[in-house]
Amino acid sequence: TTWCENPDSPRSECHGWSSAPIYEFSRMVLGAFPTRDGWSHVSVQPCPPEGLSFAEGSVPTPYGDLFIRWERRDGDFTLTVRKPEGAPLCVTAVLPDGLAVPMGSDCSLTASCTL
């Protein structure tokens, strides 16, 4: 189970309502969301919460996992995105300062800004 409000649950809490934290992590913390149907176009726009210095994870797409890592250190923010080789994903990374960086034909992108 994922909820601590009921530590002595008499039944399984492995249900759809327990999957919201995974969605929130992928969408808000990592910042990945489709901008066209079928995940053919993806935007990666992390919303780094206060107190969190880095996050990384993989977001499943129909073309394979999209790897995302961001780090905040000494006023700098660095975002790395990797898509599966040969995947027809159009990826745009949007940094916290608003700069949009398209991935292009490479399978990896690293971009930085000052916070």
Regions found by a protein language model. Give the residues of each.
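Non-catalytic C-terminal accessory modules of carbohydrate-active enzymes
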Residues: T1-L115
